[in-house]
Amino acid sequence: MSGKTIYLGVIGVGGVGAHFLTQLSRLPNAPSLVLLARSSQTVTSPAPSYSPAIAPSDWQSAFSTSSSASYTQSGAWNPDQIAAYLSKAPGRAVLVDNTSDPTVADAYPLFLSKGISIVTPNKKAFSSSFNLWKNIFNTAASTSSLVYHESTVGAGLPVVSTLRDLVATGDRITRIEGVFSGTLSFLFNSFAPATAQSGVSAQKWSQVVAQAKDLGYTEPDPRDDLNGMDVARKVTILARIAGLEVQSPESFPVESLIPAKLRGLTSAAEFMQRLPDFDDQMEAIKNQAEAEGKIVRYVGRVDVEGKVVKVGLQQFDKDSAIAGLKGSDNIISFYTERYGKNPLIIQGAGAGGAVTAMGVTADLIKVLERLH
């Protein structure tokens, strides 16, 4: 990659954002980082020259007062301010949004309308209203701006790009099925393993949830994982790419694993304290599957031909690919006309800052190649 300078803005320097900046610092011919924003601060290279660029390897110091001579420091900028700044750069601009902020996601059509390409793991933009989805891609097409969002499903796994390639080359997608949540994968692989480990006693559901929380696999409030909405958003994205006009993640059945009596609790601590009272419910579900020689897993499923999308518990044979998952891995199966009875399967780590950032960085490289 060589030629014209491309100017880069980055929003979000948390888990994924920090890993992305580390990876960016190692890229040969990296774009010129001219905007870096977090919730309370924005740092920019001075206009109109848009130089000096911010060093991604030393991004923390850009927020310090000692660097104020080199950069322009401000409070939090709204999307209009960010779009105005990047659109006036002396070359093509790219915005990397490493947040899950719906306000930023809603502004994607604005950025694209100003010729700013977008790379992001932000699921909100692509799984909220279908109107926003259409607006994003219609605006991109009319302005020659680019949109890449590999890491919205499966972190760094090539899920989105593979499905887009299948569709673009004319394959007919019949069904998509998989374990889309690293958290729920870990919970069920631990709670109901396909093969019992010798010397390891079976754990109660509440114990497995507590262990996952301690290991950092769950959100601070595990209900944000157990309600199934994260999986529903990912399934919405894939269903839309496959050609279904899914209106929102609330427009199809999503099975919540939160006991009805615990849904209204105000604190995560109280939820964790009372969860053991409902262990018998999950035990019964596990035992029912075992009585039929099967295991239970939490999956997302898109029946493209039948136009049916659903998320929830499902039983699988113990020798199935889904039953063989380990740890917090994801697995996504694409059933298509070309691949016949044996689906195209993508499997691997579906969560984690470094692998999610890898998907973002790889998308950025693709955008840079196309813009150059």
UniProtKB/Swiss-Prot annotation:
Cross-referenced Pfam families: Homoserine_dh (PF00742), NAD_binding_3 (PF03447)
Pathway(s) it belongs to: Amino-acid biosynthesis; L-methionine biosynthesis via de novo pathway; L-homoserine from L-aspartate: step 3/3; Amino-acid biosynthesis; L-threonine biosynthesis; L-threonine from L-aspartate: step 3/5
pH dependence: Optimum pH is between 9.35 and 9.50 in the reverse direction.
Record: residues binding Na(+): E150, V153, A155, L157
Residue numbers annotated as active site: K234
Binding-site list for NADPH: V16, T99, S100, K123, G352
Catalysis: reaction(s): L-homoserine + NADP(+) = L-aspartate 4-semialdehyde + NADPH + H(+); L-homoserine + NAD(+) = L-aspartate 4-semialdehyde + NADH + H(+)
GO molecular function: homoserine dehydrogenase activity; metal ion binding; NADP binding
Taxonomy, superkingdom: Eukaryota
EC number(s) per entry: 1.1.1.3
List of residues binding NAD(+): V13, G15, V16, T99, G352
Keyword Ribonucleoprotein (UniProt): no
Cofactor: a metal cation
Binding site for L-homoserine: E219, D230
Binding-site list for NADP(+): V16, T99, K123, G216, E219, G352
GO biological process, one term: homoserine biosynthetic process
Annotated InterPro entries: Asp/hSer_DH_NAD-bd, Bifunc_Aspkin/hSer_DH, HDH_cat, HDH_CS, HDH_short, NAD(P)-bd_dom_sf
Physiological role: Catalyzes the conversion of L-aspartate-beta-semialdehyde (L-Asa) to L-homoserine (L-Hse), the third step in the biosynthesis of amino acids that derive from aspartate (the aspartate family of amino acids), including methioinine and threonine, the latter of which is a precursor to isoleucine; production of homoserine leads to a branch-point in the pathway as it can either be O-phosphorylated for processing to threonine, or O-acylated for processing to methionine.
Subunit structure of this chain's protein: Homodimer.
Family: Belongs to the homoserine dehydrogenase family.
Protein name: Homoserine dehydrogenase
Organism: Paracoccidioides brasiliensis (strain Pb18)
